[in-house]
Amino acid sequence: MSVVPVVDVLQGRMPADSEITVQGWVRTRRDSKAGISFLAVYDGSCFDPLQAVINNTLPNYQNDILRLTSGCSVSVTGRVVESLGGGQRYEIQAQAIEVLGWVDDPDTYPMAAKRHSVEYLREVAHLRPRTNLIGAVARVRHTLAQAIHRFMDEQGFFWVSTPLITASDTEGAGEMFRVSTLDLENLPRTPDGKVNYDEDFFGKEAFLTVSGQLNGESYACALSKIYTFGPTFRAENSNTSRHLAEFWMAEPEVAFATLDDAAGLAEAMLKYVFQAVLTERADDMQFFAERIDKEAINRLKQFISADFAQVDYTKAVEILQNCGQTFENPVSWGIDLSSEHERYLAEKHFKAPVVVKNYPKDIKAFYMRMNDDGKTVAAMDVLAPGIGEIIGGSQREERLDRLDQRLAEMGLNKDDYWWYRDLRRYGTVPHSGFGLGFERLIVYVTGMQNIRDVIPFPRSPRNANF
């Protein structure tokens, strides 16, 4: 007899009266005076549990069934029947139940069947996927990731696995985690007293990557359309609801593409993945709309149907300066727009997703293409109502002399980027790309308030538990 997932039963894929086995964990148990017990059994395959109806004639009813509590794992064999009660179309009439695992002490079980705060759940991150909330987040996260891969594949992109250990600082910001096997109690020193990294594992300084972009450009300049999708790391000491030290990024890179091409790709990708999650995770999205953010579903539908607005950074600054609203962070040309500025543009002024383009060069990375005005670079941010920036990208600087100029301006040693510069020496082409912070995308989709609740085991300052 085959083991079937709960979702197949609840969605009617198993014929009525068929004999099946489901395996999962007990969410709740209730007993009637008529000698019948009802178990809510979930296996994570969908939001809702399956109800198992158990008669007291089962041989282990007294010794096992009446001892079951939330969190126990069970294997239930029985017949699929149409449910007479409300709440579900189908249930299972149990013919045999095997208890696979007991909860040691139900009184101290951290995941007792009640609503827990997200702050508490972070303290028990190894058990929190058993809750409705984090289970729904996990399924939505999976669907969004699969939709990104599917979209890229359909658009002819190749997935490239870029290294997590690097010697390059993509952003030039210096907020990187160092990778070393040196003995911290007995560091080797050079004659002038500095740490001698020649004796380290890689023979030089090495770090965890902040982005796969530079390596991705290498493959885009050979395969034309590639993307990376994996973890990135920032040693930024920010203990906020918007920051993680370890997070995932999706980073497409396209040869022979302009900034406008990248903006068009970003719009198409976001609409594709939002439609996928609405279609494939309707039950979980309904939960988020009911319990977390009543606009969760409507927000995605409006995003999908909206035409993206486009505005130059200079014009955006004018709009903000003349809007009559007082901002916590004053607006002037040359600043990096803050979240309040971004949200005003998307929510109040344009009332739609916005692509802000052509930022001042001094607030952007060295690899962004210099515009003809000598003051701005071909950079873009996609701003979404409700969250602000959701994607950042640019046309890359394909001219070697301009790239060297930017490296010098930012105090970066061009010899450290010798291989990146080679791409400009051997058949250089215009190319563009962007980065999508995956956890920020999940926050936007679900309405969750803290980014630490949309990644399985969050890493943040003073926190690397589990």
From Swiss-Prot:
Catalyzed chemical reaction(s): tRNA(Asn) + L-asparagine + ATP = L-asparaginyl-tRNA(Asn) + AMP + diphosphate + H(+)
Location within or outside the cell: Cytoplasm
Pfam families on file: tRNA-synt_2, tRNA_anti-codon
BP GO annotations: asparaginyl-tRNA aminoacylation
Top-rank EC class of the record's enzyme: ligase
Name of the protein this chain belongs to: Asparagine--tRNA ligase
Chief location: cytoplasm
Annotated keywords: Aminoacyl-tRNA synthetase, ATP-binding, Cytoplasm, Ligase, Nucleotide-binding, Protein biosynthesis
InterPro entries: Aa-tRNA-synt_II (IPR004364), aa-tRNA-synth_II (IPR006195), aa-tRNA-synth_II/BPL/LPL (IPR045864), Asn-tRNA-ligase (IPR004522), Asp/Asn-tRNA-synth_IIb (IPR002312), NA-bd_OB-fold (IPR012340), NA-bd_OB_tRNA (IPR004365)
